[in-house]
Amino acid sequence: MSSVLDRILARKREEVAEGRRSSEGFGDLEPSDRDFRAALAAPGRRFILEVKKASPSRGAIRPDLVLEELLALYDLHADCVSVLTDEEFFGGSPGDLKEARRLCRRPLLRKDFMVDVWQIEESRHLGADAVLLIAAALGDGELRDFSARARELEMDVLFEVHDEEELRRVLDCGADLVGINNRNLVDLSIDLQTTSRLRSLLPDDVLCVSESGINERNDLQSLPADAFLIGSSILASEDLDRKIKELVYGPVKVCGITRRADAQAALDLGATWLGFLFHPPSPRSVTVEQAREICRALPGRKVGVFVDQNPDEILSIVHQCDLHGVQLHGNYDSEAVRYLETRLQGVFLVEVFSAESLGSFEESRADYQLLDAAPQGEGGLGESFDWARLQGRDLSTVFLAGGIHPANALEAQATGVYALDLSSGLESEPGIKDPTRLAALFDKLRAGQEESS
């Protein structure tokens, strides 16, 4: 029985033969002007996000994909973009790559099954800055010839390998960028240990990209790679924006939003949620009218933060501002919480617990729990508690707040909480977000490591 790869390659050779016969040539090809490898060589974790409508392992993933909408998100959050151009098995087309060149500023990888040097030239003609060469599909001579032609066009080459022998072959061809595919191309199974096993054999000056099987941000922690190529888990998600942000940065709520400009900046940089405080004594408080204007003008998910407000008043504000979540500070008894739960259809509930009552949060019936150093009130005091106290607890639905800022955000994330909640640590003054601090936060979370001194 032939493997999936064998079937794809047989069909690809037929397609290329047809393409060559009908082609009038590509004329004088302009060299690539976007440095694919350099984008992945930046410190910390880097991300190649993929345009993919289907795959042999999953069938149709997102057949109704709107390329312009997806690429607008990738332009904000990807380091590079991979475009699958195989039509029969992956639902793509060469036209997708050409359109991506027009719509996207990021370096572009043409991901297809290269069987002829003609495809390298076609790739540059379509706008690719790099091509994928699969070691399992090519002989040594083809690997050398195809990569040489790509480099003549100042394109980078991502050499894809699955085992030690393939890795040896591509290194002999001078590979400086290696993609380790965690998927077995014979039976389509996934083994994330493939990256760990092969990475140890790479020279220090060769960049490593981990491919396939990356579904959650936690998967990144165990993969010793410089960059990650992710497609299916994003495209299979109902909420593309949220999935991309949670993979690249982890879930983050930016709270205490008072201005539309701050809200827009937070969303563009990577915030999963925006938090609006309805508590007049606080300098971060907003009126219902202010919040409604921002919430209805911008995309993204919004959370209302309430301090001892009447439950019916909370419900009214939720509907007026189209909120996605409600966060309760203060003294809400179990009856008030149940009252809100039964009436908040499609709106999640966050119950707040102080460090003083750490032992009781696991009994909460709310969708999420928020842990803060502040004993009562609306938070935003810039104080933290000893996060070591969280060890051994189930934190899968927990937001961590209090004293989190760009310099300690990775430490906070490393506690294993579901999400981070930041407010004063991102401000130039109460209620005013500092764009430099916002950018520093998401840069740090994206890289996943402390900057070297």
Stretches found by the model and what they are:
Residues 1-64:
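An N-cap/entry alpha-helix motif that binds or orients negatively charged groups
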Residues 39-60, 93-100, 144, 203, ...:
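N-terminal small/glycine-rich loop or linker at the start of catalytic domains
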Residues 45-47, 101-111, 149-158, 201-211, ...:
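Short beta-strand/loop segments at the ligand-binding rim of alpha/beta enzyme cores
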Residues 53-64, 69-90, 170-200, 273, ...:
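Glycine/Thr-rich beta-alpha phosphate-binding loop at enzyme active sites
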Residues 57-151, 155-158, 164-169, 177, ...:
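N-terminal active-site wall of soluble small-molecule enzyme domains
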Residues 115-127, 162-173, 210-230, 258-269, ...:
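Catalytic cores of alpha/beta
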Residues 122-142, 179-189, 225-247, 271-283, ...:
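Glycine-rich phosphate-binding active-site loops on the catalytic face of alpha/beta enzymes
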Residues 192-202, 234-252, 288-297, 339-340, ...:
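C-terminal helical cap(s) of enzyme catalytic domains, especially alpha/beta-barrels
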